[in-house]
Amino acid sequence: MGRKSKKIIVALALLSGISFFLFARADEEEKYVRLVKAQSVNIITDADGKAFRKAVDATFLHNGTLLICDTAYWRVDENIINAKGNVRLSQEGTELTSEKLDYYVNDNLAQFRGGVVQLRDKENNILRTHFLDYNTADSVAVFSKGASMKDKDGQIIESLDGTYSSKAKLFTFEKDVNMFTDSVFIKTQALDYHTDSQKAVFRTYIDFWKDDNMLTASSGWYERNDEIFFFTGDVHGITDKQETWCDSLYFYRIPNNVLMKGSIQLQDSLHNTTAVSRYLFYEDSLSTVTLRKEAAVAIVT
C-alpha cells in the first residue's frame, strides 16, 4: 500500500471520528437543559429539605428550544422547571406564550394548564387554549378541553381536542369542530388544516351553511387560496327554492358557481321542475343550469 493511500485512510478515519464525536455531542446536549442567562440565581430549600434553584429573568435552552420567563424554579434533582410570568417558548418559528408552564426535561415536555396559552406558527396562525402539551423533541403540540385557531386572514376553526405538528405544518381538530370563513359555517367531527397550502380537509360528515343555503356530505375539502369547496358522498343541498342530491359537488366561491357530478337529482319548486343527469353546472352570473350525460327534465303543470 502506497504512502498516499495510507494518508487517505488516516484522513477518512479522522473524519469518521470527528463526525461520531459531533453526533455524540449533539445527542448528549439534547439530554441536558442549560441555563443560558439570568439576572440572578439563588439556591433555595423547600419544606421537605429539597434544594432548587430560583432564577430571575431566566433563559433556558433545550432541544434547540428557548424557554424565557420572569421567574423559574428549577428542581434539578427531578429535572423539572416551573416557569412563571411572561413565559415564552420559542422553537424554529413556533412560539408559545402564557403566564406559567411546567417543563419536564426528561420527557421533553412543556405542560401548560389553566391559564390561556397562545401558539403562533411560522404562517402566523394563532391557536388559543387552556390545556396544551408541547414536545420539544418532535415539535408536536396536543391540546384539549376546547381551542380556537385563527389564521392570518381571519378564518376561525374551533374544536374540543387536537394537535399541531410544526414539522408537518399541520393542525388536526377533533370533536365538535366548527369552521367559520367569511359567510360560510361548517360543522364536522374531524378536520385537518395544512398551514403551508391553506387547505382544510373534512374527514367526517359535514354540515355546511352559507346564508340561507344548507348542504350535507360524507367528507370533503376547502382550498382557501383558490376559494374552492369540494364535497363527496351522499351530497344533499337545500336552498329556499331548490333541493339537490349528487355524488360529488364543487363550489367555486368567487364566481359563486356550482358543479355537480355522479347521480344527480334536482327539484325546483320555483319552476315546478324535476331533473336528473350525470353532470350539472350552475353559472351564477348568467343564472343558468347546464345538464349533460343522461339528462332528463320533467315539468309539472
Residue ranges and their predicted role:
Residues 1-30:
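Bacterial Sec-dependent N-terminal signal peptides
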Residues 23-301:
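N-terminal amphipathic/hydrophobic interface segments
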